[in-house]
């Protein structure tokens, strides 16, 4: 019998004055062990026994090893103590004006920071948790309380969990406020330190559970679900089984919130609830299959929200955010396969990226289109039923879908997940036919190899046709290749082919039109299309008023402006297009479509970045942030440029609503260099919370006037990020974004600095940033 853990019984006794805890842990072993090596970080182990007998143990830097031979049913008892962490990982302290809470973030390897354990997703066990706290506090864990005893202190003993991985355990302590709802016999509980204004998040949760139970054919497994608002939280949200944690902003959405906040909240809640089946009920064996958890939850969250909010057109956002972001990232040479070999725990956080989430989700969308909607759904249901309460691999899922659909899903998926990158399909008209060939697409313009089995779709005059393109293909009729941008590849048309597509423009969906524009921008960056040709072609889309098309064009033109602000033709093209959109959208109207409100906010903030005169006029409306939350970021950026950081800091202290407050904080990155030095003071003071630093530091290098300051203070910024966001990968992503901007003016200095600060935990971000710098330098010289 292989060694394993049957059950953990852990009692946490918290001292809420100095935020320490003492703990007694009982581990029920399964199978035979020779020395028990437990993961343990920053824990002080006092005593270890086996079946009541004292045992010798050795403490390493991040382990405690109990020496000896052990057998099935043996019981290990460990006494230990520790401090509650001040980072945003492990068992940590989260402070806000409304109070203090103890919370946990254990994914991917944070459980070892709270208690000795085998911190490995395949070592599933039952958890029996007891928490001892001051009697005026409450405690939350994955299961409902079994017993609560109150005398001098409060003892909360929770029901046993199902078998689950260590990273899904949750412990929360605080003076909480609650709102409740019910779905069937499942208690839905919204938790916050702040007053709760709306049950909107519970409504989303109820609809999501209902959708998933119907889609998977499997009931939700636990008797309750907490949605927990955490004031200081490094991740966006976390799928702890039955006790899901979120940043405050995700759970503060109400029926009257801005469209951006409502939609983001719905997608986030639906994503985490999808994990209750895909990740919690069935878990990957090791982190190389992390993508399976995250990509599936990403794809399903959009399907879920689309099922009850058609008016949002959420798959337009999916295609731009998830597919578009992944296509950009995966065209670098410093990409990685969807299924990546993970050995070092420091590597895990860096694969929580566009590939694990966006590419994986986009591949699932492509396979659903290839296998068929119902066949895909039945395959998913079979996979979950076959592996419930256990662990599985990606191949198990492909086999299930293949068994149902009868198509070679496993062969197709194995190639797509084990190989980095993706193809560009070239379409060349030859006589009365169209010749299709493929090669790997690289953003640096080099020509790649690779022969993907592409589930190709073609819109023809007679309808949609599908085929599996292995190397090349020839077709007689073509309106457009890659129908609804369902495939994860780009399409390059020769002149005649492109004319054919544009003649049929009115027949194309907005997802199809987005594909044309997205590919055009990628071909500009890679040098396949000249700047003149790009500008000529993109102007052909300027009359398209669809929200997805406007957002994509606005993003492209603003991105080019930020790359080279002193390029007159880019600045004039961007300002002209954005101004026309702002005028066309006009002021907010009562009862208007949420998509209109959302795109108004986006083009207005982009214009505030591009046009200082517009920003100066818009800044006068800074006092009206609450009137239209979708315009809050635009007005805040304008105020940052016109008034400075003191005005923004005062407003941030005034607004307790995170929907507005976070946008004010983000806009601080757009202040002048003389103001930016105050950012560190505001972090120390708490005006900028630890979790919100990343918004400021991601905007600062995008701001042409903020780049010198960022570079001069990069060591301090990295140190702050690493301390606050240990194990999350955020530092890596900030550096990936910043390095290309910083290097345009100081190429050699930035390359040298990148090597000086390089560490394993953000090595990937530095490599991607340096590669992107080389690419944008070439484009910069052409603009």
Curated annotation (Swiss-Prot):
* Species this chain originates from: Thermoplasma acidophilum (strain ATCC 25905 / DSM 1728 / JCM 9062 / NBRC 15155 / AMRC-C165)
Task: Tell me where it mainly resides.
Answer: cytoplasm
Q: Does the keyword Calcium apply?
A: no
Q: Where is the active site?
A: 272
- Gene responsible for this protein: trf2
- Name the Gene3D superfamilies for this protein: 1.25.50.20, 2.60.40.1910, Neutral Protease Domain 2, tricorn interacting facor f3 domain
Role, per record: Proteases F1, F2 and F3 degrade oligopeptides produced by Tricorn (themselves probably produced by the proteasome), yielding free amino acids.
Provide one Gene Ontology biological process annotation. proteolysis
Q: Which Enzyme Commission number(s) are listed? A: 3.4.11.-
Family named by the database record = Belongs to the peptidase M1 family.
Protein name, UniProt field:
Tricorn protease-interacting factor F2
Site annotation (Transition state stabilizer): which residues?
357
The record's PANTHER family line, in alphabetical order, gives: PROTEASE M1 ZINC METALLOPROTEASE (PTHR11533), PUROMYCIN-SENSITIVE AMINOPEPTIDASE-RELATED (PTHR11533:SF174)
**Which key words tag this protein in UniProt?**
Aminopeptidase, Cytoplasm, Hydrolase, Metal-binding, Metalloprotease, Protease, Zinc
One of the record's GO molecular function terms: peptide binding
Its domain of life reads: Archaea
GO CC, alphabetical = cytoplasm; extracellular space; membrane
Q: Which cofactor does it need?
A: Zn(2+)
Q: Where in the cell is it found?
A: Cytoplasm
Residues binding Zn(2+), per UniProt? 271, 275, 294
Q: Which residues bind substrate?
A: 107, 236-240
- Cofactor note from UniProt? Binds 1 zinc ion per subunit.
Subunit composition? Monomer. Part of the Tricorn proteolytic complex.
Q: Which Pfam families match?
A: ERAP1_C, Peptidase_M1, Peptidase_M1_N
């Amino acid at each position: 019998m292989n060694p394993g853990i049957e059950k953990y019984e852990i009692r946490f006794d918290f001292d809420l004055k100095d935020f320490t805890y003492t703990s007694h842990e009982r581990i029920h072993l399964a199978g035979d062990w020779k020395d028990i090596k437990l993961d343990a970080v920053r824990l002080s182990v006092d005593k270890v026994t086996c079946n009541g007998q004292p045992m010798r143990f050795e403490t390493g830097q991040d382990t405690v090893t109990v020496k000896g031979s052990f057998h099935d049913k043996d019981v290990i008892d460990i006494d230990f103590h520790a401090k509650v962490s001040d980072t945003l990982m492990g068992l940590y302290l989260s402070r806000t004006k409304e109070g203090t809470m103890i919370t946990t973030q254990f994914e991917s390897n944070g459980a070892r920071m709270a208690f000795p354990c085998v911190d490995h997703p395949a070592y599933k066990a039952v958890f029996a948790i007891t928490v001892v706290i001051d009697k005026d506090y409450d405690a939350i864990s994955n299961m409902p309380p079994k017993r609560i005893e109150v005398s001098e202190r409060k003892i909360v003993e929770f029901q046993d969990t199902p078998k689950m991985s260590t990273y899904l355990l949750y412990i929360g302590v605080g003076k909480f406020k609650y709102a409740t709802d019910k779905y069937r016999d499942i208690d839905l509980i919204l938790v916050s330190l702040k007053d709760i204004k709306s049950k909107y998040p519970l409504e989303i949760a109820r609809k999501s559970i209902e959708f998933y139970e119907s889609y998977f054919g499997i009931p939700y497994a636990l008797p309750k679900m907490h949605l927990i608002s955490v004031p200081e939280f490094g991740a966006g949200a976390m799928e702890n089984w039955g006790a899901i944690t979120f940043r405050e902003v995700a759970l503060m959405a109400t029926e009257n919130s801005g469209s951006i906040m409502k939609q983001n909240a719905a997608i986030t809640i639906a994503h985490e609830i999808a994990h209750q089946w895909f990740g919690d009920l069935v878990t990957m064996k090791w982190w190389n299959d992390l993508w399976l958890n995250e990509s599936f939850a990403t794809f399903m969250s959009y399907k879920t929200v689309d099922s009850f909010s058609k008016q949002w057109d959420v798959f337009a956002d999916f295609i731009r955010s998830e597919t578009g972001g992944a296509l950009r990232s995966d065209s670098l040479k410093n990409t990685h396969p969807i299924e990546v070999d993970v050995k070092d725990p420091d590597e895990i956080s860096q694969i929580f990226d566009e590939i694990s989430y966006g590419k994986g989700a986009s591949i699932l969308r492509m396979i659903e289109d290839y296998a068929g909607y119902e066949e895909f759904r039945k395959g998913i249901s079979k996979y979950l039923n076959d592996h419930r309460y256990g662990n599985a691999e990606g191949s198990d899922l492909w086999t299930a879908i293949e068994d149902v659909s009868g198509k070679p899903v496993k062969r197709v998926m194995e190639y797509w997940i084990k190989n980095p990158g993706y193809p560009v399909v070239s379409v060349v008209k030859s006589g009365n036919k169209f010749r299709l060939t493929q090669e790997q697409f690289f953003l640096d313009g080099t020509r790649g190899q690779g022969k993907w089995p592409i589930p190709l779709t073609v819109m023809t005059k007679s309808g949609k046709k599908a085929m599996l393109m292995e190397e090349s293909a020839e077709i007689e009729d073509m309106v457009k290749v890659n129908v609804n941008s369902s495939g994860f590849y780009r399409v390059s048309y020769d002149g005649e082919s492109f004319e054919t597509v544009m003649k049929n423009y009115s027949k194309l969906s907005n997802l199809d039109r987005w594909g044309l524009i997205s590919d055009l921008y990628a071909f500009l960056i890679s040098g396949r299309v000249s700047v003149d040709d790009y500008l000529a072609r993109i102007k052909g889309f300027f009359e398209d008023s669809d929200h997805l098309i406007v957002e994509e064009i606005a993003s492209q033109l603003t991105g080019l402006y930020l790359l080279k602000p002193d390029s007159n033709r880019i600045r004039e093209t961007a300002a002209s297009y954005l101004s026309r959109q702002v005028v066309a959208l006009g002021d907010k109207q009562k009862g208007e479509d949420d998509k209109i409100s959302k795109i108004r906010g986006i083009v207005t903030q982009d214009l505030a970045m591009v046009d200082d005169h517009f920003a100066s006029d818009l800044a006068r409306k800074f006092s009206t942030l609450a009137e239209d939350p979708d315009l809050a970021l635009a007005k805040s950026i304008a105020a940052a440029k016109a008034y400075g950081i003191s005005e923004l800091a005062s407003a941030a202290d005034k607004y307790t609503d995170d929907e507005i407050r976070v946008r004010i904080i983000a806009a601080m990155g757009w202040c002048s260099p003389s103001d930016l030095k105050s950012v560190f003071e505001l972090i120390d003071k708490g005006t900028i919370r630890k979790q919100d630093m990343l918004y400021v530091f991601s905007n600062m290098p995008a701001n042409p006037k903020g780049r010198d300051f960022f570079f001069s203070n990069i060591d301090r910024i990295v140190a702050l990020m690493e301390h606050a966001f240990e194990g999350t990968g955020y530092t890596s992503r900030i550096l990936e974004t910043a390095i290309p901007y910083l290097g345009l003016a100081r190429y050699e200095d930035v390359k040298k600095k990148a090597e000086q600060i390089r560490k394993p935990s953000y090595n990937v971000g530095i490599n991607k940033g340096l590669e992107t710098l080389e690419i944008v330098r070439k484009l910069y010289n052409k603009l």
